[in-house]
Curated annotation (Swiss-Prot):
Organism of origin: Neisseria gonorrhoeae (strain ATCC 700825 / FA 1090)
Top-level taxon of the source organism: Bacteria
Gene Ontology biological process terms in this record: iron-sulfur cluster assembly
Presence of keyword Calcium: no
Protein's name in the database: Iron-sulfur cluster assembly protein CyaY
Gene Ontology molecular function: ferric iron binding
Gene name of the record: cyaY
Annotated Pfam families: Frataxin_Cyay (PF01491)
Family annotation (NCBIfam families): FeS_CyaY
Length: 107
């Protein structure tokens, strides 16, 4: 398990990476980071929320498709419920919101 400061640094790097990938690829999303929450909003107002939950050292995604909790395991963020990869879930949510294929590369 990471220390709290390692977790915060890792999650901030991940949030920054997501924003950079969206900007570099020109996808139609607005990103806002405030506190522990990265809000990604599609052109039609659909939101995908990526949240850092420091006490459990988890990342959470909330989207129309549902809510997911991810814990770091061997360098990957995997869903606590079904071991789905963070990027797979995020890319599906972003693609559904935008109506086009979105693929955030792994950090």
């Amino acid at each position: 398990m990471m220390t709290e400061s390692e977790f915060i640094r890792a999650s901030e790097a991940l949030f920054e990476h997501i924003e950079d990938q969206i900007d570099e690829n020109g996808w139609d999303f607005d990103c806002r980071f405030a506190g522990n929450v990265l809000t990604i909003e599609a052109g039609d107002g659909t939101q995908i929320i990526v949240n850092r939950h420091t006490p459990n050292q988890e990342l959470w995604i909330a989207a129309k498709s549902g809510g997911y909790h991810f814990a770091e395991q061997n360098g990957k963020w995997l869903a606590t419920r079904d071991s789905r990869d963070f990027y797979d879930v995020l890319n599906e949510a972003l693609s559904a919101a935008s109506g086009e294929a979105v693929e955030i590369a792994e950090l």
